[in-house]
């Protein structure tokens, strides 16, 4: 498996990030969005600094009308990147829910803080990366 992989969970306020290092999926600090151009520039910087070859992007399945809007928004955001490597889209359905569930051992206040500071988003990106890796094995 190529070690130069970055996964992202693109949201309106934050972009969760995760990478693969020595076959271990690790969350990275999220990008806090001020606007889409600033966020795209920051993501471009991460991609260059980490010498990423594959960008894995979480994309909701096409079931509902709001998913269609989200798909368009994510596709537009990714089009702002100057990244020239491979871009793969992976179904992100329930990744945020699962990430929140994985923190159920935490007190409510700490879970809320993890949501606000983007740690939840980076845990979602970890699950997106896990789904990508599983899809490559099958």
Swiss-Prot record:
Gene3D superfamilies: YqgF/RNase H-like domain
A GO molecular function held by the record: nuclease activity
Assigned EC number: 3.1.-.-
Ranges annotated as spanning the membrane: none
Top enzyme category: hydrolase
Keyword Nuclease attributed: yes
InterPro entries assigned to the protein according to its UniProt record, in alphabetical order: RNaseH-like_sf, YqgF, YqgF/RNaseH-like_dom, YqgF/RNaseH-like_dom_sf
Coiled coil feature spans: none
GO cellular component: cytosol
Subcellular location: Cytoplasm
Protein keywords: Cytoplasm, Hydrolase, Nuclease, Ribosome biogenesis
Protein origin, superkingdom: Bacteria
GO biological process, one term: rRNA 5'-end processing
Task of the protein: Could be a nuclease involved in processing of the 5'-end of pre-16S rRNA.
HAMAP family on file: Nuclease_YqgF
Protein family: Belongs to the YqgF nuclease family.
PANTHER family assigned to the protein according to its UniProt record, in alphabetical order: POLYNUCLEOTIDYL TRANSFERASE, RIBONUCLEASE H-LIKE SUPERFAMILY PROTEIN
Annotated protein name in UniProt: Putative pre-16S rRNA nuclease
Organism expressing this protein natively: Helicobacter hepaticus (strain ATCC 51449 / 3B1)
């Amino acid at each position: 498996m190529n070690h130069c992989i970055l996964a992202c969970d693109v949201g309106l306020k934050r972009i969760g990030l995760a990478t693969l290092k020595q076959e271990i999926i690790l969350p990275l600090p999220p990008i806090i969005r001020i606007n889409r151009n600033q966020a795209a520039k920051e993501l471009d910087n991460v991609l260059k600094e980490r010498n990423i070859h594959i960008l894995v992007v979480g994309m909701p399945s096409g079931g509902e009308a709001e998913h269609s809007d989200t798909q368009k928004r994510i596709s537009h955001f990714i089009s702002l990147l100057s990244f020239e490597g491979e871009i793969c889209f992976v179904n992100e359905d329930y990744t945020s829910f699962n990430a929140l569930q994985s923190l159920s051992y935490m007190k409510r206040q700490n879970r809320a803080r993890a949501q606000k500071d983007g740690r939840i988003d980076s845990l979602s990106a970890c699950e997106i990366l896990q789904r990508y890796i599983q899809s490559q094995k099958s």
